[in-house]
Amino acid sequence: MSSSTPTTPSIERTASTIWGGRFDSGPSAVMEAINASIGFDKRLYRQDIAGSKAHCTMLVATGILSKADGEAILGGLDRILAEIEAGDFPFSVALEDIHMNIESRLKDLIGEAAGRLHTARSRNDQVATDFRLWVRDAIDGVEGALARLQDVLITRAEEHADTVMPGFTHLQAAQPVTFGHHLLAYVEMIGRDRGRFHDARVRLNESPLGSAALAGTSFPIDRAMTAQILGFDRPCANSLDGVSDRDFALEFLAAASIASIHLSRLAEELVIWTSAQFGFVRLPDAYSTGSSIMPQKRNPDAAELVRAKAGRVIGDLASLLIVMKGLPLAYSKDMQDDKEPVFEAADTLELCIAAMTGMMETITPKVDRLRTAAGQGFTTATDLADWLVRALGTPFRHAHEVSGALVKMAEKKGVGLEDLSLAEMRTIEPRLTDEAIKVLSVDWSVRSRTSFGGTAPDNVRAACAAARARYAAKAPPR
C-alpha cells in the first residue's frame, strides 16, 4: 500500500498499539483511566500540530523523509487542525493523550506515512515542546491583560491626582495621600509582574525538539531549523535537560502567584472601601451581587472572588513544586501532572485580571468621603513634627514627642489637631506659631510631599506620564 493511501486497521486502535509490542496483554480499564490525559491536554492541539509541522518540514529538508510523505503529513495535519477547531475531531480516551489522538487520526487520513512523522522524535521531546509553546502563548496573553489593567489604573490615577484620601499602616489612618498615588502603587506592582513574565519567557524560549527520549538521536536532524520555525531563540543545549526541565512552568506559576497576590491585595482594599463603615468607593451593579434574604445588601462579590482565587493559583505553584521535587532525570510519568496546575492558574489569572480591570475602570470614588476620612485619626501629626524640625530646628525625636503630646491632648478633648487653639498647643511647645496650624491641613500635607515618588498631586501627574512611557516600552517580543 502506498504511503498516501489511508489505512483502516483491523482492530480498534489504542495507545497500547503504539507502544505495546513487548507486552502480552493490554492495560486494564483502571490503568487506562489513570494514564489518560486527553481530558485536559487536548488544549495543546495547536502547539502539537505546530511542532509536528516543524518536525516534518525539517525531516524533509534533511532528506530523512520524502517530499511526498512530507506533503501528505502536512496536509493531514492541516485537516486535523480544521476538524478540532470545528468540533468534529473524534477524541478517544483509549489513545491516552493529544499526541496519540492526532497521530492516530493522521494515520486514518493518510495511511502509513503518518508513522514516519515520529522518526527522530519521542513523546518526551514532543510534549516538552508543546508545553513550552503553550506556556509562551499564555505568558503573552497574561502580559497583555496586565498591560491593559495597568493602563486603566494609570488613567484613574490621572483623574484622581488631586483626590485626597487617608493612607494607612496597620489599617489605621497614617498620613494623607491622593487616590491617584495609591493606584500608582499597584501600577508599579503590575509592572514588576510583567517583568517577571517577560523574564520567564526569555528563559523558556529554547527548543527541546530533537532531544528525543533523552539521549538525542542518530538521525542527521537540524534542531536549529525546527527551533527557528517555532520561534525559539535556539535549541536547548542538553537533551537530558530538554526533556526533564519544567522550570519554565514553575516560573510561570511563580509569576502568576505573585501577580495574584497583588490582585488579591487590591481586591481586599475594594472590599474594605466599599463597606458602609468606610464608604470610600462604589462598585457598579455589574460587579456586585445581592442577598437572597436581605434586600438592602450590595455585596462586592467580584472583588471577594479575586481575593479567594489567588489561593488557587498559589496552590497550583505548590502542586507542581511538589511533583518535581524528587524526580530523577529524565522523564517520569509524574510529569503528566504538570499541565493541569498551569492550565488552571492561567485560566484563573486571566479571569481575575479581567474582573479587576472591569472593576477599576468603573468604580466611583466618593471624593468628599475620602477627604473627610483623610483628616480623621490625626493624620497630619507627622507634618507638625516635620515643621518643628524645619522651622525651629528641633531634633526629630523631640519633635515627635511634642506632636504626640498634642495628639494626646486633642484625643482627650475629642477634637482634631487642627481644632486645638494656638494657646492650647503652646502649653506643650511655647514656640509654636500660626504657621504650625497651616501644616495641619490635609491639602497642605499632600502638596508638601514633593520628594521623588511622593504623593504631591504634581508628582502624581508626572508619575502617570512616566509610567505610561516606561511600561509601554517593556512589552515582551511577540
Swiss-Prot record:
The keyword Transferase does not apply. Pathway: Amino-acid biosynthesis; L-arginine biosynthesis; L-arginine from L-ornithine and carbamoyl phosphate: step 3/3. The keyword Disulfide bond does not apply. It catalyses: 2-(N(omega)-L-arginino)succinate = fumarate + L-arginine. Keywords: Amino-acid biosynthesis, Arginine biosynthesis, Cytoplasm, Lyase. One of its GO terms (biological process) is arginine biosynthetic process via ornithine. InterPro entries: Arg_succ_lyase_C, Argininosuccinate_lyase, Fumarase/histidase_N, Fumarate_lyase_CS, Fumarate_lyase_fam, Fumarate_lyase_N, L-Aspartase-like. Disulfide bonds: none annotated. Its EC number is 4.3.2.1. One of its GO terms (molecular function) is argininosuccinate lyase activity. Its main location: cytoplasm. It comes from the Bacteria. It is found in: Cytoplasm. GO terms for cellular component: cytosol. Belongs to the lyase 1 family. Argininosuccinate lyase subfamily. NCBIfam families: argH. This is Argininosuccinate lyase. The gene is argH.
